């Protein structure tokens, strides 16, 4: 389900003294099954971008197309849009409120027209997608789980409607290292199942490890668009513009600055360790 933004701009409070242009002339396409990371400083337009893709707001200028159709056209089926595109805001676990996991995950399906059996099947499938045993957790309170588990339950509530696109806003914020890795592995699995992932994150390490394409916004405009290796290899330009880079890329650059034979395109821990092994082997020859 290709997503296309054609010369999209968005202004908050247009025509007033409080007007702020959040996006300006953004054009891009996201293909079926992609895993796209979105980066940028605070105020760069990231949250506005994903709200436009999800159809929560309409562009001031330009168009947003899904499968070639303008999602803001009067005749466009908005209910179908919200089934196709799932949006998970930051800290979604704070929105858990039902008495059981099953009821919470099923909440968004109340007006879907599904029978009780169909709803139960959708809830079961969604919970299994995020790594839960349906029978083991269905009757438990969602509030009794760990932070990472609560977040997975909240995402199951979005997945229950079987979206083809999943948008995640800072999904690993506040998680401990183990919870963060488990969560990202789950997102990888969803992507392998064919779900298009669009993930906003300030965590450059997470994007380097998992996103196959990264979009960088600056001052509401498209600043960079490429593979993780392409984006993070341009170390000094990113740092100059206040955009984060993976910690391992920083470490590699520190060694390069001290004369160590360290390539400038290392962005993964595995690459860094492999290079250190080579350097140690050379030293001990």
Residue ranges and their predicted role:
Residues 162:
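Conserved catalytic motifs of ABC-family nucleotide-binding domains
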Residues 219-220:
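Conserved ABC ATPase "signature" C-loop
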Residues 141-145, 149:
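Conserved ABC ATPase signature
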Residues 166-169:
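Catalytic Walker B motif of ABC-type/P-loop ATPase nucleotide-binding domains
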Residues 39-41:
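The feature captures the beta-strand-to-loop junction immediately N-terminal to the Walker
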Residues 63-80:
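ABC ATPase NBD Q-loop/coupling interface
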Residues 54:
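Helix-to-loop junction immediately C-terminal to a conserved catalytic motif
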């Amino acid at each position: 389900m290709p997503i296309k933004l054609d010369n999209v701009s968005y202004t908050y409070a247009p025509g007033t003294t409080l007007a702020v242009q959040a996006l300006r002339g953004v054009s891009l396409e996201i293909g079926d099954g992609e895993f796209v990371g979105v980066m940028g400083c605070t105020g760069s337009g990231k949250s506005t971008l994903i709200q436009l893709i999800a159809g929560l707001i309409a562009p001031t200028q330009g168009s947003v197309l899904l499968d070639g159709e303008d999602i803001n056209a009067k005749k466009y089926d908005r209910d179908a849009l919200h089934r196709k595109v799932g949006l998970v805001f930051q800290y979604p676990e704070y929105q858990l409120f039902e008495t059981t996991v099953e009821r919470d995950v099923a909440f968004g399906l109340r007006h879907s027209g599904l029978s009780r059996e169909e709803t139960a099947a959708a809830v079961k499938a969604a919970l299994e997608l995020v790594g839960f045993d349906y029978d083991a957790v269905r009757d438990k309170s969602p509030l009794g789980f760990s932070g990472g588990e609560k977040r997975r339950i909240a995402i199951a509530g979005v997945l229950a409607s079987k979206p083809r696109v999943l948008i995640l806003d800072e999904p690993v914020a506040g998680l401990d290292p183990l919870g963060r890795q488990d969560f990202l592995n789950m997102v990888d699995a969803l992507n392998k199942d064919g779900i298009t992932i669009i993930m906003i994150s300030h965590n450059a390490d997470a994007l380097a490890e998992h996103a196959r394409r990264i979009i960088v916004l600056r001052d509401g405009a498209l600043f960079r668009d490429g593979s993780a290796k392409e984006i993070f290899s341009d170390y000094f330009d990113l740092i100059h513009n206040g955009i984060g880079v993976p910690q391992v890329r920083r470490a590699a650059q520190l060694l390069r600055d001290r004369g160590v034979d360290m390539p400038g395109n290392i962005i993964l821990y595995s690459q860094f360790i492999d290079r250190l092994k080579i350097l140690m082997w050379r030293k001990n020859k």
